[in-house]
Each structure stands twice: as structure tokens, then as C-alpha cells.
Amino acid sequence: MSFRALSVFSLFLSYLILGSAEQCGRQAGGALCPGGLCCSQFGWCGNTDDYCKKENGCQSQCSGSGGDTGGLDSLITRERFDQMLLHRNDGGCPARGFYTYDAFIAAAKSFPAFATTGDDATRKREVAAFLAQTSHETTGGAGWAAPDGPYTWGYCYNRELNPADYCQWDPNYPCAPGKQYFGRGPMQLTWNYNYGQCGRAIGVDLLNNPDLLATDPTISFKSAFWFWMTPQSPKPSCHDVIIGAWSPSGSDQAAGRVPGFGLITNIINGGLECGQGWNAKVEDRIGFYKRYCDTLGVGYGNNLDCYNQRSYNNGPSVDSM
């Protein structure tokens, strides 16, 4: 037996012996490890190469940096954040004053692989893509002649307008009495089972306290990062797509699903926006993305839309949350 095989076997054996180790990944409903630890192929948390290297089967938070933002605050400074989300604190925005730069940076510390993987262009492109998709979800610039253009009005809302309960029976994540699970936060997370999974991953009881996504800005950003960083089979994570770590399977290729910003739209809201030809919502997402890429001085990459992509049929997304 090689040293590598022995190492993996020993690691697996230790999991059987140490039943108290914290679970994560597909073995634990997509849960993330606390403190930015890596999730191994076996669903346990740690910070060594056996846990953290992709080639060793790492499932999430694979940088192993233990919570460092890796220079995110230099990649996107407070001034640049304010420039990109220019009108988020406008008097007409219901969420004015909520989405702060400090909360954005603090939340990112729980997801150390965000915008720290790859070269400078890849890191900037991930920031642009994340802010673009979440800006579309929270935009206040649609449907009127918005000053400075519609793509300066992201992060205007933190609650869904005219919401329903979004409660569906689930044995693992039952709805709490009197609670509603409508869209909240940058990614507008919906449905009780998504609140439950997200809360479990970030260590917050969101089933009983769903409104934390609209009252605590750091937790709110964490919910969006959780969605961004977490794969939900058969969907890859948005993170893996934008950094180039995902390759389409045969079924993906047959469905026209190719790497690029457009696939992220498919992951988030493909059931309503993809595979149907031109779509104004897809164009809005692309508009935000191009503006943010231009602001950060990085190219857009290929395959920006999902017009010819079939949507995924399962896994959490904005259209199925």
C-alpha cells in the first residue's frame, strides 16, 4: 500500500473511531465546516491536505485558510464597493443602510475560498459575478428611468415584496409556527428547507428566526455566500463555475450547459429564465455583470447567457426555493 493510500485509509479509519468529529458536505445536507475549515471527501472538517485539496476529494471551503479573506478587502475596497452599489442607500430603497461593506467582509471570512482562488482576473470575476447576480435579485432599478442607469441600483431590497409563506412539509426542516420563509437577503433565499440547510451550515437557527436574513446584515450576506459556495447535485456551485473548476458532463453538454456566467444564472433561476430564448431578466443580470467587470478592470469571459441551456430539474434555486 502506498503512503498516499495509507494516509487516506488512516484518515477514514480515524473518522470511524472519532465519532465526535463534525460532519459536512453531501453527508450532512450540504453543511459547511465552521471557522472556514475544509470538508473532506468523507464529510469531516479539518485543515490538512487530506481535507483541503481538491484532488483529495475536498467538497467545500477547499482553500484551508481557516477564515482569512485572502485580501478580499484589497480586491474590493470600501470605496469600490460603494461605487459598484451606488444607490443601495438611496432614500427610495427599503433596505437603505442595511447592506454594509463591513458585513460583506465579515461574512466572507466564513467562506475563505470566495474570491481567493485563481489569478487576479479570476478573483475579480468572481466578485463581479456574485455582486451581479445578487444585485439583480435585490434591484431597485427596474421599470423606471433610474438615475445613473439601472445597473447602479443593486441591493435596494432585503425582503420579497408581497410574499407568501413558502412553507412545504419537510421532515428534516419543518416550518416553525407562524414563520414565513419568503425571499430575504442578497440571494433572496426562500422555502423552509433552504432556510434550514443554510442555518445548519452557518450555525444559526433560521427556521425559528428567518427574519435574521433581513435584520442582521452579516448573517444575510452569509446566506448568499452559502448558496454561492455550496454545490447541490446535479448543480455545481456558482463558485466552481466562475473559477473554472467545473467541467460539463455528457448530460450537461447535451443540455447546452457550458461554463460561464450564464450557467450561474441557470443554477440560480434556470427554471424561469433559461432555455427559452431571449429573456429580459437574463439581460439584466448580464448588464450588472458587465458593469462590475468594467469597474474591476476584468474581462467578461464566455457564455454570458443561458438562452440555449436546459434548466436543472432539482436542487435549491431562486425559482424552486
Curated annotation (Swiss-Prot):
Keyword terms: Carbohydrate metabolism, Chitin degradation, Chitin-binding, Disulfide bond, Glycosidase, Hydrolase, Plant defense, Polysaccharide degradation, Signal, Vacuole
InterPro entries for this protein: Chitin-bd_1, Chitin-binding_1_CS, Endochitinase-like_sf, Glyco_hydro_19, Glyco_hydro_19_cat, Lysozyme-like_dom_sf
Record region (Hinge): 65-98
Any one GO CC term of the record: vacuole
Signal peptide bounds: 1-21
Catalytic site positions: E137
Enzyme type, top EC level: hydrolase
EC number: 3.2.1.14
The UniProt record lists the keyword Transmembrane: no
Protein location: Vacuole
Residue span of region Catalytic: 99-321
Pfam families named among the record's database cross-references: Chitin_bind_1, Glyco_hydro_19
Domain Chitin-binding type-1: 22-64
Swiss-Prot/TrEMBL induction comment: In response to infection, elicitor, ethylene, wounding.
Substrates-to-products reaction catalysed: Random endo-hydrolysis of N-acetyl-beta-D-glucosaminide (1->4)-beta-linkages in chitin and chitodextrins
CDD domains tied to this protein: chitinase_GH19 (cd00325), ChtBD1_GH19_hevein (cd06921)
One GO BP annotation of this record: polysaccharide catabolic process
One of the record's GO molecular function terms: endochitinase activity
Lineage top rank: taxon: Eukaryota
Chain ranges passing through the membrane: none
Family designation: Belongs to the glycosyl hydrolase 19 family. Chitinase class I subfamily.
Role according to the record: Defense against chitin-containing fungal pathogens.
Protein name from the UniProt record: Endochitinase 1
